[in-house]
Amino acid sequence: MAFAKISQVAHYAPAQVVTDDDLSKIMDTSDEWIRSRTGIQERRISLNENTSDLATNVAYQLLEKSGLSPEELDFVLVATISPDNSMPSVAARVQGTIGAVNAFAFDITAACSGFVFALATAEKLIKSGAYKKGLVIGAEVLSKTLDWSDRATAVLFGDGAGGVLLEESEEEHFFGESLNTDGSKGGLESGASAVISPYSDGTEQPNPYMQMDGKAIFDFAVKTVSKSIKALVEEKGEPDYFLLHQANIRILDTMAKKIDVSRDKFLANMMSYGNTSAASIPILLSENVANETLKLGSDQTILLSGFGGGLTWGSLIVKI
């Protein structure tokens, strides 16, 4: 039977750093206001790179680190809520740019749970025995979706991308999974489009910007998501580290208490990147491999958990 493993990781973020103090010059906010409520101190903002550019950078890094040629890839999956355009998909753009001529490619839209959903999907593709190698990338340019006069959202989000190379393995590396959706609730919405045709009445004026009910998302995370993670941990055992979606430092603090796990096991980097939605978990994973907190091939276990708009939430326990 075929299994899947994470064999390489990579991340990329735009060079432009925007601090809380920078934001205080263009809107009614302050470093103290942002940091005390979110833990965020700065974020990266793209000047001219689009989502596919960030994702392609990560793809090239993964190929270089692995020594693979793009022709050896079987698939490219990209999790994003900020694509370059509705079609072609970001994944198709990446596939075409890197020359992965033998790979199929598609995007997954599950907001801040997107990378977890994409990784779970990719693991099943390899486990089927039909595919051996593929890229799973989370990439966002959320800055283009924001109303920069709305401090409730504009201070939270940033741009970036991260990803993994998933390959066939003789040993099991994915030990626990919980994927969930509650479409009766929203919490986070972005990029609404009007219904326009010669037959529509033309009265609809949807908001094109990112909108979020912060309190609802916070309550959802610390209640529903923490309960889901706790159940998975009780069933599969406590992992070495928890890599949760990087939305808010207070969410991590509260969830550690709810799950009854040492806060030291919860890795964090939203201080430097803000909320990068589907990119946050792979960026966090790649950074912690780079600083050697995590080591590929060490048999460390990690819990990856995303949660956000949809509502969606999902967790995986993975041996790296």
From Swiss-Prot:
SUPFAM superfamilies: Thiolase-like (SSF53901). Its main location: cytoplasm. It comes from Streptococcus thermophilus (strain ATCC BAA-250 / LMG 18311). InterPro entries: ACP_syn_III_C, ACP_syn_III_N, FabH, Thiolase-like. One of its GO terms (biological process) is fatty acid biosynthetic process. The keyword Membrane does not apply. Keywords: Acyltransferase, Cytoplasm, Fatty acid biosynthesis, Fatty acid metabolism, Lipid biosynthesis, Lipid metabolism, Multifunctional enzyme, Transferase. Homodimer. It is found in: Cytoplasm. The active site is at C112, H245, N275. This is Beta-ketoacyl-[acyl-carrier-protein] synthase III. GO terms for cellular component: cytoplasm. It holds the Pfam family ACP_syn_III_C. GO terms for molecular function: 3-oxoacyl-[acyl-carrier-protein] synthase activity; beta-ketoacyl-acyl-carrier-protein synthase III activity. Pathway: Lipid metabolism; fatty acid biosynthesis. Its EC number is 2.3.1.180. It catalyses: malonyl-[ACP] + acetyl-CoA + H(+) = 3-oxobutanoyl-[ACP] + CO2 + CoA. The keyword Transferase applies. Residues 246-250 are annotated as: ACP-binding. It comes from the Bacteria.
